[in-house]
Amino acid sequence: MLNTDKWTCRHAALALAAFGVESVVTSPGSRNAPLLMAVSRHGGLMTLSVVDERSAAFIALGIAEISQRPVALVCTSGTALLNYAPAVCEAYHKHLPLIVISADRPEEWIDQADSQTMRQPDALSNFVKLSVDMKAEPADEEQKWLYTRRLNEALDCALAGCPGPVHINIRISEPLTAQAEYHNEQFHRISVVTPPEKVSTTTARALANDVRQKNILIVAGFGAPDAALNKAISSLGRLPNVVVLAESLSNLHSDDVLQVSDSLFSGISADKSAGFVPDLLISFGGAIVSASLKRFLRQADIAEHWHVGTERNLIDTYRHLSTAIQISAPAFFPRFAGALNFLNKNCAGISQFKKNWIDIANRRSVVLWHKLQAVPWNVATAIGHVIEAAPISGMNLQLSNGLAVRVASMSCLDKFHRVDCNRGVSGIDGSTSTAVGASLAYKGGDTLLITGDMSFQYDLGALASNYLTSKLRIVLLNNGGGGIFKYIKTTRSLPEVDSLFRCQLNVDAKAIANAFGLKYYHADSYESLQDAVPAFFAGPAPAILEIATDAGIDAAVLTETTTNN
């Protein structure tokens, strides 16, 4: 087959396929021409071309998150690589294996006033697991052996242990489009054998025996759906001395799991807080959205805290860490749940600790419902109506950061197959691109994105890609720009809140929808929302439903629903 004459570029493509990569998101360029030829001419790789590298990287992230497979990125030299940084950083903190491959100029031309040239090796070093630097044309067989090993090291590193992104930098000399015939080239993959993750029955029973009589609070952060984990956590939640708190992003669905939102903690008064403090806290998953939960746990007098996970750092979010159990949650909890259920099988009646949590959750749910019925048109009630009207058809939900993830968490999201948000570093950039990637990877139904106006405008490049599918629906929350800053305590009382924080926007969502070929719907009242929502979900896609609200009213409603009354 006719292919690039650059050995390392061809073998990088072979390595991707050997390690299970199926999707490669590329961006146009000249220096990366050999790489583009290599990946596009490999029959086992599907390429998607996206002009905007920042958007391309978030699309790749969305594909990786939903497919649970490594995804590669290919860019040209210069600042193109730096545009990957936000998504790569998010992937690092969400433990997603993005394989970044950047074309570079020859080493002798760095810092020599040559165009589109910068110091690329280690440019992403703060948020990749490994960086490697190679020439496109090895000098001899020994260097080919070296580069084969480096490609193995990089790809194995991306997938091993706690997964994450890696960076492969390839220095390419001219001519860039030279080609030759190559047949039956193979990549020598080095097999790395690791022992399976396993908790022995003896260890699980020893741990369970130590804590069987303690009040246990399990807190779940964000994570992918996992049937075995869900079953284990549900069984723990049924025990008389165990309370499970989970945010919607944890993707745990059970009547025995209490859903977390800031409104839950507004019902816990200072004089009663001791009754909610566990003897043992067990945490797992990614970052928590609820500031109230974090504040409560950090201030509580908790004697013992276990964190379960494969992160390389010690995760002490709540400042009480006593034990780091370095194994994945799906490997740990089924054994631990089995042991604790066996030891507590004859326990009768629930603890006062658990009664306290169940009571506050039930009371706050009723209070929240009544409050939202008694307020004028606002974003929280509107989103609640959209979520309630969403079809139960295996739909995935993507949330942007800021107001969207907080407001959506006030509703029950169990009808969705999974719920995701870029909470690795919680940026507002890339939400739409991530949803585009997620919709490409998810085969079970539609993808619904709920996004704020600032996040939406930040990532318009996603709509310009060629990969908007008929399975993508977008709910745009338009409160004039950055309405969350009128709600959060740090900014709402500042005189500059409107001029410097909200950055009030005049987003013409209808014109944007028309420009990019999306069906458009609009709601600015309960009546218009009731008319728009059925058509939005039943009509053609991709589509945008713009919900226009007043930022001041939204802030007042959110403040009211998270106060203790």
Regions found by a protein language model. Give the residues of each.
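Phosphate/pyrophosphate-binding active-site segments
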Residues: 1-4, 134, 297-403, 510-511, ...
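N-terminal cofactor/phosphate-binding cores enriched in small/glycine residues
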Residues: 4-89
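Active-site diphosphate/adenylate-binding microenvironment
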Residues: 9-17, 27-31, 35-37, 358-444
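A short, small-residue-rich loop immediately preceding and capping a beta-strand
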Residues: 22-26, 46-48, 66-105, 277-285, ...
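Thiamine diphosphate
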Residues: 101, 108-121, 407-565
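Glycine-rich, acidic loop regions that bind phosphate or pyrophosphate groups
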Residues: 102-154, 246-360, 466-467, 489
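Glycine/aspartate-rich loop-and-adjacent alpha/beta segment that forms the canonical ThDP
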Residues: 122, 163-165, 170-200, 532-565
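Glycine-rich, anion-gripping cofactor-binding loops and their flanking helix/strand elements
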Residues: 220-306, 314, 414-444, 457-461, ...
